[in-house]
Amino acid sequence: GEELGATVRSADITEILISDLLEFVHQYSVPRYKLKNRSGKNNSQQGTDVIAYKYKNEDKTPNDKDELVAAEVKATLSNTEYIPIKNAIIDSRKDEHRLARSVNYCRKRLKELGKIEEVKRFLFKPDNNYRITYVAAGVSSRENVDDAIELDFSGEELEIRKNELIFYVHGKKLMELAHNIYQRCCK
Protein backbone atom coordinates (compact mmCIF):
# COMPACT_ATOMS: atom_id res chain seq x y z
CA GLY A 1 0.00 0.00 0.00
CA GLU A 2 0.81 3.66 -0.20
CA GLU A 3 3.19 4.89 2.51
CA LEU A 4 2.48 7.93 4.63
CA GLY A 5 4.40 11.02 3.56
CA ALA A 6 6.94 12.70 5.83
CA THR A 7 4.57 15.56 6.72
CA VAL A 8 1.79 13.21 7.82
CA ARG A 9 4.25 11.02 9.73
CA SER A 10 5.57 14.09 11.50
CA ALA A 11 2.07 15.33 12.35
CA ASP A 12 0.87 11.93 13.56
CA ILE A 13 3.93 11.26 15.72
CA THR A 14 3.80 14.70 17.32
CA GLU A 15 0.07 14.43 18.08
CA ILE A 16 0.76 11.05 19.69
CA LEU A 17 3.67 12.59 21.63
CA ILE A 18 1.51 15.44 22.98
CA SER A 19 -1.30 12.97 23.76
CA ASP A 20 1.18 10.86 25.75
CA LEU A 21 2.48 13.96 27.55
CA LEU A 22 -1.05 14.93 28.60
CA GLU A 23 -2.04 11.37 29.56
CA PHE A 24 1.04 9.98 31.26
CA VAL A 25 2.68 13.11 32.69
CA HIS A 26 -0.35 15.33 33.41
CA GLN A 27 -2.86 12.52 34.15
CA TYR A 28 -5.59 13.47 31.63
CA SER A 29 -7.81 11.01 29.79
CA VAL A 30 -7.03 11.29 26.07
CA PRO A 31 -9.36 9.73 23.48
CA ARG A 32 -7.29 8.39 20.57
CA TYR A 33 -9.76 8.26 17.67
CA LYS A 34 -8.69 11.07 15.38
CA LEU A 35 -6.26 9.01 13.29
CA LYS A 36 -8.94 6.41 12.50
CA ASN A 37 -11.23 8.73 10.50
CA ARG A 38 -9.12 10.05 7.64
CA SER A 39 -10.46 10.81 4.20
CA GLY A 40 -7.12 9.56 2.83
CA LYS A 41 -3.79 8.27 4.14
CA ASN A 42 -2.04 11.60 3.62
CA ASN A 43 -4.92 13.81 4.76
CA SER A 44 -5.06 15.06 8.30
CA GLN A 45 -8.42 14.93 10.09
CA GLN A 46 -9.88 18.41 10.64
CA GLY A 47 -10.67 19.73 14.10
CA THR A 48 -8.83 20.06 17.37
CA ASP A 49 -5.53 18.13 17.20
CA VAL A 50 -5.68 16.60 20.68
CA ILE A 51 -8.54 16.54 23.18
CA ALA A 52 -7.99 15.58 26.80
CA TYR A 53 -10.10 15.78 29.92
CA LYS A 54 -9.89 15.29 33.65
CA TYR A 55 -12.62 14.85 36.24
CA LYS A 56 -12.30 16.41 39.69
CA ASN A 57 -14.47 13.73 41.32
CA GLU A 58 -13.36 10.11 41.18
CA ASP A 59 -16.93 8.97 40.40
CA LYS A 60 -16.98 11.45 37.46
CA THR A 61 -19.97 13.40 38.74
CA PRO A 62 -19.91 16.90 37.23
CA ASN A 63 -17.83 19.51 39.04
CA ASP A 64 -16.95 23.01 37.88
CA LYS A 65 -13.28 22.04 38.34
CA ASP A 66 -13.56 19.33 35.66
CA GLU A 67 -11.26 20.28 32.81
CA LEU A 68 -11.33 19.92 29.04
CA VAL A 69 -8.08 20.49 27.13
CA ALA A 70 -7.80 21.45 23.46
CA ALA A 71 -4.26 21.15 22.12
CA GLU A 72 -3.05 22.59 18.83
CA VAL A 73 0.11 20.78 17.73
CA LYS A 74 2.60 22.14 15.19
CA ALA A 75 5.86 20.49 14.24
CA THR A 76 8.88 20.81 11.99
CA LEU A 77 10.80 17.66 12.81
CA SER A 78 13.27 18.11 9.98
CA ASN A 79 14.72 21.39 11.29
CA THR A 80 15.58 23.28 14.46
CA GLU A 81 13.39 26.37 14.08
CA TYR A 82 11.15 27.72 16.84
CA ILE A 83 8.40 28.51 14.31
CA PRO A 84 6.14 25.60 15.41
CA ILE A 85 5.63 27.36 18.76
CA LYS A 86 4.47 30.55 17.05
CA ASN A 87 2.21 28.65 14.62
CA ALA A 88 0.67 26.60 17.43
CA ILE A 89 -0.09 29.75 19.46
CA ILE A 90 -1.72 31.45 16.47
CA ASP A 91 -3.73 28.39 15.37
CA SER A 92 -4.76 27.54 18.94
CA ARG A 93 -7.27 30.39 18.69
CA LYS A 94 -9.19 28.37 16.09
CA ASP A 95 -9.83 25.67 18.70
CA GLU A 96 -12.45 27.88 20.35
CA HIS A 97 -14.58 27.28 17.24
CA ARG A 98 -13.61 23.65 16.48
CA LEU A 99 -13.70 22.23 19.99
CA ALA A 100 -17.44 21.45 20.17
CA ARG A 101 -17.33 19.60 16.84
CA SER A 102 -14.26 17.63 17.95
CA VAL A 103 -15.79 16.68 21.32
CA ASN A 104 -18.96 15.58 19.54
CA TYR A 105 -16.88 13.39 17.21
CA CYS A 106 -15.21 11.79 20.27
CA ARG A 107 -18.65 11.22 21.78
CA LYS A 108 -19.75 9.35 18.65
CA ARG A 109 -16.65 7.16 18.68
CA LEU A 110 -17.06 6.43 22.40
CA LYS A 111 -20.74 5.60 21.83
CA GLU A 112 -19.67 2.91 19.35
CA LEU A 113 -17.56 1.41 22.15
CA GLY A 114 -20.32 1.69 24.77
CA LYS A 115 -18.47 4.46 26.65
CA ILE A 116 -20.63 7.47 25.77
CA GLU A 117 -20.70 8.82 29.34
CA GLU A 118 -16.92 9.27 29.21
CA VAL A 119 -17.05 12.61 27.36
CA LYS A 120 -20.79 13.45 27.25
CA ARG A 121 -20.40 15.73 30.28
CA PHE A 122 -18.28 18.12 28.18
CA LEU A 123 -20.90 18.65 25.46
CA PHE A 124 -23.18 21.09 27.32
CA LYS A 125 -21.10 23.63 29.24
CA PRO A 126 -24.10 25.76 30.32
CA ASP A 127 -25.68 22.72 32.03
CA ASN A 128 -22.55 21.72 33.95
CA ASN A 129 -19.78 24.29 33.95
CA TYR A 130 -16.15 23.17 33.57
CA ARG A 131 -12.77 24.70 32.77
CA ILE A 132 -11.32 24.79 29.26
CA THR A 133 -7.56 24.94 28.82
CA TYR A 134 -6.00 25.63 25.44
CA VAL A 135 -2.55 24.19 24.77
CA ALA A 136 -0.26 25.44 22.02
CA ALA A 137 2.34 22.71 21.45
CA GLY A 138 5.36 23.20 19.22
CA VAL A 139 7.79 20.40 18.37
CA SER A 140 11.11 20.63 16.52
CA SER A 141 14.48 18.88 16.24
CA ARG A 142 16.36 21.52 18.17
CA GLU A 143 18.85 19.87 20.52
CA ASN A 144 19.18 22.76 23.00
CA VAL A 145 16.88 25.67 23.77
CA ASP A 146 18.14 29.25 23.91
CA ASP A 147 17.76 31.20 27.16
CA ALA A 148 15.43 33.61 25.35
CA ILE A 149 13.20 32.64 22.45
CA GLU A 150 12.07 35.40 20.09
CA LEU A 151 9.10 34.47 17.93
CA ASP A 152 8.48 37.73 16.01
CA PHE A 153 4.84 38.21 17.00
CA SER A 154 2.77 41.25 16.16
CA GLY A 155 -0.45 42.74 17.53
CA GLU A 156 -3.06 40.34 18.86
CA GLU A 157 -0.98 37.32 17.73
CA LEU A 158 1.01 37.95 20.91
CA GLU A 159 -1.99 37.62 23.21
CA ILE A 160 -1.78 34.50 25.33
CA ARG A 161 -5.07 33.77 27.03
CA LYS A 162 -5.38 33.29 30.77
CA ASN A 163 -6.33 29.65 30.25
CA GLU A 164 -3.59 28.85 27.71
CA LEU A 165 -0.47 26.74 28.16
CA ILE A 166 2.51 26.51 25.83
CA PHE A 167 4.49 23.30 25.43
CA TYR A 168 7.73 23.09 23.47
CA VAL A 169 9.07 19.60 22.89
CA HIS A 170 12.45 19.36 21.24
CA GLY A 171 15.15 16.83 20.62
CA LYS A 172 17.86 15.96 18.16
CA LYS A 173 16.86 13.99 15.03
CA LEU A 174 13.11 13.79 15.73
CA MET A 175 12.29 13.22 12.04
CA GLU A 176 14.62 10.23 12.04
CA LEU A 177 12.77 8.97 15.13
CA ALA A 178 9.39 9.46 13.39
CA HIS A 179 10.57 7.44 10.37
CA ASN A 180 11.94 4.67 12.62
CA ILE A 181 8.68 4.41 14.57
CA TYR A 182 6.67 4.34 11.35
CA GLN A 183 8.86 1.58 9.88
CA ARG A 184 8.54 -0.51 13.04
CA CYS A 185 4.76 -0.14 13.01
CA CYS A 186 4.61 -1.31 9.38
CA LYS A 187 6.46 -4.57 10.11
Give short role names for the model-derived ranges.
Residues 119-187:
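Charged, structured surface patches that assemble and position nucleic-acid processing machinery
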Residues 53-70:
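Active-site beta-strand-loop-beta-strand hairpin of nuclease catalytic cores
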Residues 16-25:
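Amphipathic alpha-helical segments that form well-ordered structural scaffolds
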Residues 32-37, 47-58:
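Active-site glycine-rich loop that binds ribose-phosphate moieties when present
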Residues 22, 50-52, 69-75:
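Conserved catalytic cores of phosphodiester-cleaving nucleases, focusing on short active-site segments
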Residues 79-146:
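Acidic, metal/cofactor-coordinating or nucleic-acid-engaging core segments within structured domains
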Residues 1-16:
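Interdomain/boundary linker segments immediately adjacent to catalytic/signaling cores
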Residues 24-43:
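A short acidic/basic microdomain associated with nuclease active sites
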